[in-house]
Regions:
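Rhodanese-like catalytic fold shared by cysteine-dependent sulfurtransferases
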Residues: 1-46, 50-56, 64-97, 103-144
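Conserved beta/loop motifs at nucleotide-recognition and modification sites
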Residues: 59
Length: 144
């Protein structure tokens, strides 16, 4: 399909063309916002490797009740509102990789950006959050 055919199609189908353009802009906008917030994403398998090779600190930023129902083995629970560079868990881990985990991988991005601005060099957000972890078939620990 050349440009002339594409333009003719768009002229014959203005609603469909507008919807496609709108969706494309929305996707590009969301990706730009994600990058501007500083959310370096980490796949579940890469998280396992990072913990094993570099002793990454995994912080689950969900509420305590959700954490107790199921969390990544070895993760520490720290409510999203408490994620501050001076918190004792984070102050000791400034030179380590830090991975933030939320439910679906969205709400942790703001905290990741804040930590990066505070000088934490290796901050990641688990792609897909705890839901992505489960979809990858990886185990959860229960309780505290």
């Amino acid at each position: 399909m050349n440009f002339a055919e594409l333009a003719a199609f768009a002229g014959r189908n203005p609603i469909l063309s507008s919807a496609l353009a709108g969706l494309t802009l929305a996707i590009l906008g969301m990706e730009a916002m994600r990058l501007l917030r500083g959310g370096h994403r980490l796949a579940p398998a890469a998280l396992t490797a990072l913990v094993n090779r570099e002793d990454a600190l995994v912080l689950d930023v969900r509420v305590a009740a959700d954490f107790e129902k199921g969390h990544i083995p070895g993760a520490k629970q720290l409510a999203l509102a408490e994620v501050k560079p001076e918190h004792k868990l984070l102050a000791m881990a400034k030179s380590r990789p830090v991975v933030l985990v939320c439910k679906a991988g969205q709400s942790a991005e703001g905290a990741a950006s804040m930590l990066r601005k505070a000088g934490f060099e290796r901050v990641f957000v688990l792609d897909g959050g705890i839901d992505g972890w489960q979809q990858a078939g990886l185990p959860l620990a229960k309780g505290r």
